[in-house]
Amino acid sequence: MLSLQFITHQTENYSYLESARMALEGGCKWIQLRMKEASPEEVEAVALQLKPLCKAKEAILILDDHVELAKKLEVDGVHLGKKDMPIGEARQMLGEAFIIGGTANTFEDVKLHHAAGADYLGIGPFRFTTTKKNLSPVLGLEGYTSILAQMNEAGIRIPVVAIGGIVAEDIPAIMETGVNGIALSGAILQAPDPVEETKRILNI
């Protein structure tokens, strides 16, 4: 089964919580609660409702950026973007038990995050995406192939999740580059039935 990380997104039809609930219902086992414009209090309110839902489905829950909150709420970990707290600092604060993921766009990013102790890397974007502002250069299939080859050559063994503007039809070709999983948001939420779409994607 595909290793799928669902990244929450608020749309006209769905709240952050509802988007995560549908992904869980469809069988997704890894949720990243991402609420970029929200205050820590707003994130905490949603996380407190989402945590038991994830637990009931035996799914991993990580927060985007909010390291202190992740520690306070005892979720499974955090995902840190390029402008968030440095991974090394987060590791000191959280200890070894928490999952820490980092965003990477180049092999240089990969080396830095690996050295800092990241548990996995979200590498992207695959293509242009409307869910993220200040987008890094688009990688495409060639970008993943190149970065993974350099990782292999350098002996860097760390799980890679492809992220950024990915739709279901892209998944087979992206997985062939050697990545370990896929992160999705819009591809699921824009489907007529997000629960069924999650199930379908997990079986690609």
From Swiss-Prot:
The gene is thiE. Its EC number is 2.5.1.3. It catalyses: 2-[(2R,5Z)-2-carboxy-4-methylthiazol-5(2H)-ylidene]ethyl phosphate + 4-amino-2-methyl-5-(diphosphooxymethyl)pyrimidine + 2 H(+) = thiamine phosphate + CO2 + diphosphate; 2-(2-carboxy-4-methylthiazol-5-yl)ethyl phosphate + 4-amino-2-methyl-5-(diphosphooxymethyl)pyrimidine + 2 H(+) = thiamine phosphate + CO2 + diphosphate; 4-methyl-5-(2-phosphooxyethyl)-thiazole + 4-amino-2-methyl-5-(diphosphooxymethyl)pyrimidine + H(+) = thiamine phosphate + diphosphate. Binds 1 Mg(2+) ion per subunit. Belongs to the thiamine-phosphate synthase family. InterPro entries: Aldolase_TIM, ThiamineP_synth_sf, ThiamineP_synth_TenI, TMP_synthase. Pathway: Cofactor biosynthesis; thiamine diphosphate biosynthesis; thiamine phosphate from 4-amino-2-methyl-5-diphosphomethylpyrimidine and 4-methyl-5-(2-phosphoethyl)-thiazole: step 1/1. This is Thiamine-phosphate synthase. It comes from the Bacteria. NCBIfam families: PRK00043.2-3, thiE. GO terms for cellular component: cytoplasm. It comes from Bacteroides fragilis (strain ATCC 25285 / DSM 2151 / CCUG 4856 / JCM 11019 / LMG 10263 / NCTC 9343 / Onslow / VPI 2553 / EN-2). Mg(2+) binds at D65, D84.
